[in-house]
Amino acid sequence: MAGRSEEDQQLLQAIQIIKILYQSNPCPTPAGSRNARKNRRRRWRRRQAQVDSLATRILATVVHGSQDNNLVDLPPLEQLNIRDPEADRLPGTGTVDPGTKDN
């Protein structure tokens, strides 16, 4: 066995990418108030779900080949990042349900 096959190389590269994804979302720190810890854990779980979804798609693409019926085209993996979309909002710019009335 002088070297690895191309399929093995692709699988190893996918595993390295998945490892980097998981390492980019460390567990939240236990510091702060109870509410702050709760919010950090909630945001972490949401990001972790995104990482799980991406990892599943990456691994499925490598193992089973690319699917032609993808509804969304993914950008190159080098451009993907994990961020909290709620952190980008300005305070007070949340969505308001017009069906509710203020009492």
From Swiss-Prot:
Subcellular location: Host nucleus, Host nucleolus; Host cytoplasm
Gene3D superfamilies listed in its UniProt record: 6.10.140.630
Region (Homomultimerization) residue spans: 17-25
Annotated spans, Disordered: 24-49, 82-103
Positions with biased composition (Basic residues): 35-48
Motif range (Nuclear export signal and binding to XPO1): 72-83
Any one GO molecular function term: RNA binding
Chain ranges for the short sequence motif Nuclear localization signal and RNA-binding (RRE) as given in the UniProt record: 33-49
InterPro entries: REV_protein
A Gene Ontology term for the protein's cellular component: host cell cytoplasm
Pfam family, one: REV
Keyword Ribosomal protein carried by entry: no
Keyword S-adenosyl-L-methionine among UniProt keywords: no
Entry-annotated residues carrying Phosphoserine: 5
UniProt record, GO biological process: mRNA transport; viral process
Keywords (A to Z) from UniProt: AIDS, Host cytoplasm, Host nucleus, Host-virus interaction, Methylation, mRNA transport, Phosphoprotein, RNA-binding, Transport
Post-translational modification: Asymmetrically arginine dimethylated at one site by host PRMT6. Methylation impairs the RNA-binding activity and export of viral RNA from the nucleus to the cytoplasm.
Domain remark from Swiss-Prot or TrEMBL: The RNA-binding motif binds to the RRE, a 240 bp stem-and-loop structure present in incompletely spliced viral pre-mRNAs. This region also contains the NLS which mediates nuclear localization via KPNB1 binding and, when the N-terminal sequence is present, nucleolar targeting. These overlapping functions prevent Rev bound to RRE from undesirable return to the nucleus. When Rev binds the RRE, the NLS becomes masked while the NES remains accessible. The leucine-rich NES mediates binding to human XPO1.
Miscellaneous note of the record: HIV-1 lineages are divided in three main groups, M (for Major), O (for Outlier), and N (for New, or Non-M, Non-O). The vast majority of strains found worldwide belong to the group M. Group O seems to be endemic to and largely confined to Cameroon and neighboring countries in West Central Africa, where these viruses represent a small minority of HIV-1 strains. The group N is represented by a limited number of isolates from Cameroonian persons. The group M is further subdivided in 9 clades or subtypes (A to D, F to H, J and K).
Function: Escorts unspliced or incompletely spliced viral pre-mRNAs (late transcripts) out of the nucleus of infected cells. These pre-mRNAs carry a recognition sequence called Rev responsive element (RRE) located in the env gene, that is not present in fully spliced viral mRNAs (early transcripts). This function is essential since most viral proteins are translated from unspliced or partially spliced pre-mRNAs which cannot exit the nucleus by the pathway used by fully processed cellular mRNAs. Rev itself is translated from a fully spliced mRNA that readily exits the nucleus.
Subunit structure, interactors included: Homomultimer; when bound to the RRE. Multimeric assembly is essential for activity and may involve XPO1. Binds to human KPNB1, XPO1, TNPO1, RANBP5 and IPO7. Interacts with the viral Integrase. Interacts with human KHDRBS1. Interacts with human NAP1; this interaction decreases Rev multimerization and stimulates its activity. Interacts with human DEAD-box helicases DDX3 and DDX24; these interactions may serve for viral RNA export to the cytoplasm and packaging, respectively.
Family per record: Belongs to the HIV-1 REV protein family.
Protein name according to UniProt: Protein Rev
